[in-house]
């Protein structure tokens, strides 16, 4: 499935995660704003197919591994609509986002985190060139409990297709 990435519009919000619910795990949600697409800050992009249909979205925020600006890198996430899953869309989208970061920013590393039970995302990240680094214990609150996850990364110097 050929895909492309584009900035959000207000029309996209109801189609994306949580768009149909005013609540999340913590209670009532704040009014959703259209996320920005600036690669140097927190942001997101919509994943679309050839005819412009929304397949899902990518988001990112920066994490810091040291005190200077050179020690920060984006942590990315992906969400796919059910009909887009299992078709290689997530792999293509995450690889495309990594390429954008390495072409347009000076980051050395892009990270991703996924639940230990999310085998599909683990496979997707591996196919996109990410390396598994280890378990992050009790890192994500979901479904009423803290859950373990796996941390993945890809470096600027890692081979990519």
Model-identified regions with their sequence ranges:
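Active-site rim helix/loop that mediates acceptor-substrate recognition in acyltransferases
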Residues: 24-50
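Acyl-donor (CoA/ACP) binding surface of acyl/acetyltransferases
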Residues: 1-23, 44, 48-161
